[in-house]
């Protein structure tokens, strides 16, 4: 309609619409130019011109020229028609908003006012327009919309003359509305409305013309008008809803009408307008909506105002303004959509629509007045929302049909259309659009509407009868909108039906849709196809409404099994769904209220009952399971819409209802289960009491509620008790609060008393508490229960029976005191819960002197800071304290040196992980334990025992070790010197221990075995070696400890240098992480991580993977296990810089194989040991110069960076950067010079002073070390400079290797040790950073092989080794070349961390004035953390750890990176 007028053209094809648009060409959709620029006055004047003459004329002409005008009406008239009737109606009504457009009908209104009065009949139409566009669609669309809409929206559709009439009318409207540019602007100018109305009236035959018919016509015209005068068409919204459901479409009977723009402009163009016509019999409703909303603002008083005034106001209203348009939007109304439409809109509309149809021609004014109260605008708005295009087209089509059909038929058809539309809505709309001009707005939608219209046409007669009741009933709108509602059952149905007979339901549905245009199928639209099918299949669905009742369901299943099947696959589902569908459809069709009554039986409550009754089960026993769930689900929806009201009211009746204890919902007496929560109906009070459960109390309450007066329902059941904790009311039988589980006051207190007594609290205040807190007074509720006690910690009041605070679980003060032997607190707990006693300090409580926290009497330690109670003696040992207790519990003591005799301590301190305890992992303390047998069971971290010695030399006499079998323990950094109580100082961080043990066995005090971080430990190697020889201990993961037992299975000794004697050849290599187990026997290499095992005699000694320590073979005991920055100077004694980080340890003893610096990080270990003095195992930056000469045979098994120079060919433990010259079994970076395998010397620079026996071991992967030593290149010495002449540094990172003989062994010269370059001329597997004299396969710094290594500068033709600077400037290493290769510990100025060179670029801790200061000619202390110059020596001999000692500091320029701020 709007499309017709506005180019949207009534349903005329787009052409008409366009023509009309051309007509309206001057008038733009929101033409503010002409109409609005005209101004209200001009508009009003124009309106006045057309009002009386045009409007009245049209009014008469409508009746006279129903056909001719109907086209006009179609174009503008349908909308004006609506305006007339609607305007009259709406003018009086609040719906005048539509009339706003119709306002031109004020004059018409005068004429049509009777019509408007008839609109009173039309009031429903008015309602329909605004709220019941659906209803109007249902009725009017079917009735008058067919007539009016057809002409206007699609003249071709019902009214052939309408087609031309529409054009004609458009012209009329246009001509008349030429003046009515206002209407153009507003979309429906009041004049246009008048003209249209007049035409509409003409179009609408008096009988056909009902306010609805006219409205439908007017709706179409409104659309036409909208087309004519573009305006925001709310109908678009309504149309959408139409697509959603016919109810929506019906609601948006004036889909073409835009709540925003009274003009013809609608979304979807002509199609939208057509949809409006089709959708609703009240085509004007769409326009009315537009105008009406505007009018409603201005026009509510129009009923009283004169037609002229009305027109003027309407003209003003019609002017589309954002506000007016916004008001027209049905968004808010959309929700009212259902209720108003369903109730007043549909119900009233159906009945009133008929009346209006009859009366509409008669005084519309009266009806207008009636409609005013209607919240139609809202409803209209709602309708608008529902569907955009479809509603307009449907409206028009429906209007045409409606005109043809009786008003009742129209209504029923519109309902059907609604249903169909919900199912078919868009297709139907589209069909009308295609068929008639009305489809011009939305061709597709129009066509579908026509189809619907066709469907509607047969249906209208049936629907008329049924719909009269149904429309008034909510169920009708519900049926439209209930589609979603029914969809509940439908979804269920669809789910279950597929199994039973989904095919049947679909065909039936189709048939029903086509065949059963009758009212019953109409409702089916809400539910999916299934419902529709059943509705058609089962006309007796009305009877079926009882289906909701289980019995009813059974009947349907039995009688209408096929129909039911159609509805839902499951028999039960089918039964439920079918009955619901039947009931809903037929009942809504027959009478809107009838379904509700039937639904009463079939209501959700009933459904819920049915499971209880089992009659539904009876219906389909097999299907029951499925049915139960689906039925329950389905029925509630049905009952909710139709019968819930009645049944709910009944349920409220005391006699006929019982209250669910669970959800407090009133259920019917017949319901065995709560309809809401499905809780079973509770037996009577007696039964419940017998049951003894909480349920009886609930049932009692409901019983009392129903039985007693209204107030009694709110009275607590007799015997109920309020929880004094959470104030929740509990049933009499409840012993505990259901919410907080607090015991019932009477019982709880008694329990508390008993408990209190039972609890051993000496002071039983509970006895006094025994008094039950039974006082019933109100204040008593707030009184603390007798015997309750307040938690001194969190101040929560606890019951007497509680032994612990419910909140913080603190023990009850009395109980605690009883346990603690301080009974006083008990009285406190039992006593002063209420008074100021709360603030009294509990007896026996004590304040912590440290943190002032109040502690319970029984607490021996402060709960906050764990400080010992002032009076008590704290067993807790401080971190650095030494515990002298022999049996000190091995409680993972961190830094405590326990000075207890090692033997007793060892025996007693087993099993516990003492962190710093002497027995366990002593971090910075030296534990002197005489030989203690049991000592190592605990995970002693730094304990000298065999327990997991990290960087500590473990010096335990073999006998002792045998006795102890301490190996088990995981000594992290301790050296286990069992014999010597003080043997290995566990994990000495910065301490330099210069204790020389004359005897290897008596290493006890001198061996700072435990993880001496930066300490230089000078211990005589003898003690450790002797100790080691006999026993196998050290099975336990000695991390950095130096295990001196010959057999010592140094299990993962991290950095301990284990000087093991030849005595125990069976040394088990237990993964000593940094520990060097130097056992004379070919001890299996224990992965000594940083430890160097130096075994003088045992060529076979396999060094466990010594990680980064350089074991000086001079002294069998490298005690400074993991000595960080300590330079350990132990000549004869086993200097054990185990894991000496940057310790430079000159060890004078060659004979003693004990690798001293186990895992010397930056430690420079100088061991003169001839026999492959264990080179610093895993000496990180440590440069160890060992003079040990028997390196040749050492097979460094995977020693990481250690260069092993031991005469024996012990299995070399994977030395990372160590170069094992001789048979070095894949020492990673190890250059194994000596038969002794070096334990993974990480960056330590092992300097085999005199080890010439082997070809110069290429120092394996010396990170920043310059290895100038010929023989042994430090195995992966990180920053250490290896001065061994022969060492071809294998993969020396920043080190310059001067040793030419670096076999390309990956790390070792012979075996593919990682960073080890083997001096042997034999081609070695390419060592990663090692330089192989024979072949330089990625060899670092090997003179023979020139491939440039990354940072290595080889003075010879060697390719620059990675970090090595032979002659070229290594990265951080300072060589003679001084080429900066950034050798980390190199003495070169290039970024020398610990470089000796004065130009130490970034020399970290190196003392570098002398390039060879590290005792290595190459002087490239590549990242030698502890070169001889104090490099990073924490506790080193007077060397400042972090100060680069030497002029290098002065020479070095460090630029701090400064972030530039933009």
Curated annotation (Swiss-Prot):
There is a cross-link at residue 354 (Glycyl lysine isopeptide (Lys-Gly) (interchain with G-Cter in SUMO2)). Belongs to the NUP153 family. The keyword Protein biosynthesis does not apply. Gene3D superfamilies: Zinc finger, RanBP2-type. Zn(2+) 3 binds at residues 791, 794, 805, 808. This is Nuclear pore complex protein Nup153. The lineage of its organism: Eukaryota, Metazoa, Chordata, Craniata, Vertebrata. A zinc finger (RanBP2-type) spans 653-683, 717-746, 785-814, 842-871. GO terms for cellular component: cytosol; nuclear envelope; nuclear inclusion body; nuclear membrane; nuclear periphery; nuclear pore; nuclear pore nuclear basket; nucleolus. The gene is Nup153. Residues 237-1405 are annotated as: 29 X 2 AA repeats of F-G. It is found in: Nucleus; Nucleus membrane; Nucleus, Nuclear pore complex; Nucleus, Nucleoplasm. Zn(2+) 4 binds at residues 848, 851, 862, 865. Its main location: nucleus. Binds at least 4 zinc ions per subunit. Coiled coil: none annotated. Contains FG repeats. FG repeats are interaction sites for karyopherins (importins, exportins) and form probably an affinity gradient, guiding the transport proteins unidirectionally with their cargo through the NPC. FG repeat regions are highly flexible and lack ordered secondary structure. The overall conservation of FG repeats regarding exact sequence, spacing, and repeat unit length is limited. It comes from Mus musculus.
């Amino acid at each position: 309609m709007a499309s017709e007028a506005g180019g949207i053209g009534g349903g005329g094809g787009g052409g008409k619409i366009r023509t009309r648009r051309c007509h309206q060409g001057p008038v733009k959709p929101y033409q503010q130019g002409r109409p609005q620029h005209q101004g209200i006055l001009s508009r009003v004047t124009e309106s006045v011109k057309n009002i009386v003459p045009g409007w009245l004329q049209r009014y008469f002409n409508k009746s006279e020229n129903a056909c001719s005008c109907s086209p006009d009406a179609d174009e503008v008239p349908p909308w004006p028609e609506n305006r007339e009737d609607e305007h009259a109606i709406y003018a009086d009504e609040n719906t005048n908003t539509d009339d706003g457009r119709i306002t031109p009908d004020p004059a018409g209104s005068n004429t049509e006012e009777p019509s408007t009065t008839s609109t009173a009949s039309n009031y429903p139409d008015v309602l329909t327009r605004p709220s019941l566009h659906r209803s109007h669609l249902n009725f009017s669309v079917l009735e008058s919309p067919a007539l009016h809409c057809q002409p206007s929206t699609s003249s071709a559709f019902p009214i052939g003359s309408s087609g031309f009439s529409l054009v004609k009318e458009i012209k009329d409207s246009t001509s008349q509305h030429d003046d009515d540019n206002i209407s153009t602007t507003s979309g429906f100018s009041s004049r246009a409305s008048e003209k249209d109305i007049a035409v509409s009236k003409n179009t609408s035959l008096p009988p056909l013309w009902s306010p609805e018919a006219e409205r439908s016509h007017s709706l179409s015209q409104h659309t036409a008008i909208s087309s004519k005068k573009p305006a925001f068409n709310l109908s678009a919204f309504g149309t959408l809803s139409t697509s959603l459901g016919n109810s929506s479409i019906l609601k948006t009977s004036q889909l073409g009408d835009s709540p925003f723009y009274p003009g013809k402009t609608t979304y979807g163009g002509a199609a939208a307008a057509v949809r409006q016509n089709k959708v609703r019999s009240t085509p004007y409703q769409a326009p009315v909506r537009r105008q009406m909303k505007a009018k409603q603002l201005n026009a509510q008083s129009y009923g009283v105002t004169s037609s002229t005034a009305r027109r003027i106001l309407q003209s003003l209203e019609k002017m589309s303004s954002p506000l007016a348009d916004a008001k027209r939007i049905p968004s808010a109304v959309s929700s009212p959509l259902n209720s108003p439409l369903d109730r007043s809109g549909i119900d009233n509309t159906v009945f009133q629509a008929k009346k209006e149809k009859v009366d509409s021609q008669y005084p519309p004014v009266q009806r207008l007045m009636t409609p005013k109260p209607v919240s139609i605008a809202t409803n209209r708005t709602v309708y608008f929302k529902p569907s955009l295009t479809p509603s307009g087209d449907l409206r028009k089509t429906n209007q045409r049909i409606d005109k043809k059909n009786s008003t009742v038929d129209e209504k029923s058809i519109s309902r059907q259309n609604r249903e169909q539309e919900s199912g078919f809505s868009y297709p139907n709309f589209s069909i009308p659009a295609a068929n008639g001009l009305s489809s011009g707005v939305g061709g597709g939608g129009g066509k579908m509407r026509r189809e619907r219209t066709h469907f509607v046409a047969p249906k209208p007669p049936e629907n008329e009868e049924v719909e009269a009741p149904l429309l008034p009933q909510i169920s009708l709108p519900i049926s439209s909108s209930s589609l979603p509602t029914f969809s509940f059952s439908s979804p269920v149905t669809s789910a279950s039906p597929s199994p039973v007979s989904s095919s049947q339901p679909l065909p039936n549905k189709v048939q029903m849709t086509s065949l059963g245009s009758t009212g019953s199928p109409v409702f089916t639209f809400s539910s999916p196809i299934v419902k529709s099918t059943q509705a058609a299949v089962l006309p007796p669905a009305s009877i079926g409404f009882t289906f909701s009742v289980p019995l009813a369901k059974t009947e349907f299943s039995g009688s209408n099994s096929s129909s039911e099947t159609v509805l839902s696959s499951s028999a039960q589902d089918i039964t439920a769904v079918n009955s619901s569908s039947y009931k809903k459809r037929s009942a809504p069709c027959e009478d809107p209220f009838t379904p509700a009554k039937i639904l009463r039986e079939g209501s959700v409550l009933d459904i819920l009952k049915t499971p209880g009754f089992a009659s539904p089960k009876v219906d389909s026993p097999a299907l029951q399971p499925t049915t139960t769930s689906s039925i329950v689900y389905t029925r509630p929806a049905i009952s909710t819409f139709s019968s819930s009201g009645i049944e709910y009211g009944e349920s409220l009746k005391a006699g006929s209802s019982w209250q669910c204890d669970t959800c407090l919902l009133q259920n019917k007496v017949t319901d065995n289960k709560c309809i809401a929560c499905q809780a079973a109906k509770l037996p009577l009070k007696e039964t419940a009491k017998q049951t003894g459960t909480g349920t009886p109390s609930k049932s009692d309450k409901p019983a009392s509620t129903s039985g007693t007066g209204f107030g009694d329902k709110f009275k607590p059941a007799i015997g109920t008790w309020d929880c004094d904790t959470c104030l929740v009311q509990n049933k009499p039988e409840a012993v505990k609060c259901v919410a907080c589980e607090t015991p019932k006051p009477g019982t709880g207190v008694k329990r508390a008393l008993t408990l209190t007594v039972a609890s051993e609290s000496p002071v039983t205040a509970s006895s006094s508490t025994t008094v039950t807190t039974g006082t019933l007074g109100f204040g008593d509720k707030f009184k603390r229960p007798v015997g309750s006690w307040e938690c001194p910690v969190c101040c929560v009041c606890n019951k007497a029976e509680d032994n612990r605070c419910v909140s913080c679980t603190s023990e009850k003060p009395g109980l605690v005191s009883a346990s603690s032997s301080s009974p006083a607190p008990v009285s406190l707990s039992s006593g002063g819960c209420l008074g100021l006693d709360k603030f009294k300090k509990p007896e026996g409580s004590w304040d912590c002197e440290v943190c002032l926290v109040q502690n319970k009497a029984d607490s021996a330690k402060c709960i906050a800071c764990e400080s010992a109670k002032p009076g008590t003696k704290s067993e807790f040992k401080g971190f650095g304290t030494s515990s002298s207790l022999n049996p000190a519990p091995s409680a993972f003591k961190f830094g405590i040196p326990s000075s207890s005799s090692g033997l007793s301590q060892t025996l007693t301190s087993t099993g516990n992980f003492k962190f710093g305890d002497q027995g366990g992992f002593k971090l910075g303390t030296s534990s002197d334990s005489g030989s203690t047998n049991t000592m190592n069971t605990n995970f002693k971290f730094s304990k000298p025992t065999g327990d997991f010695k990290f960087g500590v030399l473990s010096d335990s006499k073999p006998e002792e070790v045998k006795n102890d079998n301490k190996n088990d323990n995981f000594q992290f950094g301790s050296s286990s010197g069992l014999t010597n109580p003080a043997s290995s100082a566990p994990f000495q961080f910065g301490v330099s221990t210069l204790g020389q043990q004359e005897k290897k066995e008596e290493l006890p005090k001198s061996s700072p075995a435990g993880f001496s971080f930066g300490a230089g430990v000078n211990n005589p190697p003898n003690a450790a070696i002797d100790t080691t020889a006999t026993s196998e201990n050290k099975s336990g993961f000695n991390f950095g400890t130096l295990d001196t037992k010959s057999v010592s299975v140094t299990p993962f000794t991290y950095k301990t240098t284990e000087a093991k004697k030849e005595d125990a050849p069976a040394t088990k290599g237990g993964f000593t992480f940094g520990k060097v187990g130097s056992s004379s026997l070919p001890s299996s290499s224990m992965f000594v991580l940083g430890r160097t095992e130096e075994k003088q005699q045992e060529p076979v000694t396999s060094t466990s993977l010594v990680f980064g320590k350089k074991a000086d073979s001079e002294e069998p005991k490298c005690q400074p296990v993991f000595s960080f920055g300590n330079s350990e100077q132990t000549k004869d004694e086993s200097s054990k810089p185990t894991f000496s980080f940057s310790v430079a340890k000159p060890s004078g003893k060659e004979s003693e194989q004990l690798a001293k610096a186990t895992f010397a990080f930056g430690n420079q270990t100088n061991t003169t040991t001839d026999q492959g003095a264990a080179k610093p195992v895993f000496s990180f930056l440590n440069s160890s110069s060992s003079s040990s000469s028997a390196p040749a045979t050492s097979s460094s098994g995977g020693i990481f960076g250690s260069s092993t120079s031991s005469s024996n060919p012990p299995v070399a433990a994977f030395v990372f950067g160590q170069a094992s010259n001789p048979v070095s079994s894949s020492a990673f970076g190890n250059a194994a010079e000596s038969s002794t395998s070096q334990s993974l010397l990480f960056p330590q620079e092992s300097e085999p002073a005199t080890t010439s026996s082997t070809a110069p071991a290429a120092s394996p992967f010396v990170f920043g070390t310059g290895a100038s030593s010929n023989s042994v290149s430090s195995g992966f010495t990180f920053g250490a400079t290896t001065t061994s002449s022969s060492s071809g540094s294998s993969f020396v990172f920043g080190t310059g290797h001067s040793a030419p003989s670096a076999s390309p062994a990956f790390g070792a010269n012979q075996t593919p040790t990682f960073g080890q370059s083997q001096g042997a001329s034999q081609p070695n597997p390419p060592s990663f950073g090692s330089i192989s004299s024979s072949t330089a396969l990625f060899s670092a710094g090997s003179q023979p092989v020139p491939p440039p290594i990354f940072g290595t500068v080889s003075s010879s033709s060697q390719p620059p080794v990675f970090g090595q600077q032979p002659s070229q400037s290594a990265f951080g290493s300072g060589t003679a070349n001084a080429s900066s290769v950034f050798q980390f510990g190199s003495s070169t100025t290039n970024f020398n961390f610990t470089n000796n060179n004065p130009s130490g670029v970034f020399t970290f801790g190196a003392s570098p004035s002398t390039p060879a200061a590290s005792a290595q000619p190459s002087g490239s202390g590549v990242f030698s953390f502890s070169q001889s110059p104090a490099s990073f020596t924490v506790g080193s001999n007077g060397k400042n750890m972090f100060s680069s000692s030497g002029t290098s500091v002065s020479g070095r320029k460090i630029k701090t990176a400064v972030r530039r701020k933009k």
